[in-house]
């Protein structure tokens, strides 16, 4: 793949380095404009963003909190009832609420514009790809966008309530009272959602790392047990101290790892087929030259 050997839009000649920079600049500008557009939309809908999204996971009436508590009642345990008491938040700066509003709008703009950003960079690299590479990469862009949003939703509906409950209820001494700053709360929430969005990109990362030969399905299978241990350690850290919650968080991550192994195996199989076809074509060409 030769990025700087791309053809121009009309395909009549190769683009110069400066022409590549100009094209990349416009892709970046369009990506920034998409972020700004969604940022403005999020800024305008302040009440909906904060009351129904940002502040929702800390409320006892939040979907996940109610569902886990109902499940706990069926199992005759109170361990699953999380965030039963409303969490009070404070603001300690004069301009704190305004800057918080702006920063939340920026994060929302970045999340909502993620597919546009991927598409713009795909359009930049597309001319440098062969037809079969372009086909795979286009599917990867769609899959990456979908996986990112699924990851963000998983972080919001599953990890965020569990983590907020654990962190807000953890105490080193009864004499210490929590007074949680709104920026600390939002920072925790956005970090969780963005982190899980990126973690859910694992199958896409496995796809490209296998394509360039960095990893193999054999390598991933070899270290499967290590991955399982790491996943359960992470789940134990960010969830309440009960096996059910830890398993609930760990299962999707384990599924992602297995899907990544499957994708890596498919890519390796395709690479081997392409190599065999190339060798057969080489042998055929040598035979034809020898007989001519």
Please identify what each model-predicted range represents.
Residues 1-292:
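Membrane topogenic/interface segments and analogous intrinsically disordered interaction regions
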